[in-house]
């Protein structure tokens, strides 16, 4: 399995990602806690900024209304290679 690096700019932390779980769960397992509610892309509470890289969604498209360009929903996405985020 190929690994990716998740860099979190505002807390100066890097995480090695080698699994098939969501970005939100990876962050939680590394003691980085985000606000969330639905874990399925409907509420939009967990949204964070994607500074660099790409993610893919496990659902067709998050349902949360009016998300901005470069905002992602870690509850229902996974990194496509290395990413840089701001939480």
From Swiss-Prot:
PROSITE patterns: 2FE2S_FER_1. Residues 4-87 form the 2Fe-2S ferredoxin-type domain. Its cofactor is [2Fe-2S] cluster. One of its GO terms (molecular function) is 2 iron, 2 sulfur cluster binding. Keywords: 2Fe-2S, Electron transport, Iron, Iron-sulfur, Metal-binding, Transport. [2Fe-2S] cluster binds at residues 38, 43, 46, 75. It comes from the Bacteria. Binds 1 [2Fe-2S] cluster. Gene3D superfamilies: 3.10.20.30. CDD domains: fer2. Pfam families: Fer2. InterPro entries: 2Fe-2S_ferredoxin-like_sf (IPR036010), 2Fe-2S_ferredoxin-type (IPR001041), 2Fe2S_fd_BS (IPR006058), Beta-grasp_dom_sf (IPR012675). This is Uncharacterized ferredoxin-like protein BU177.
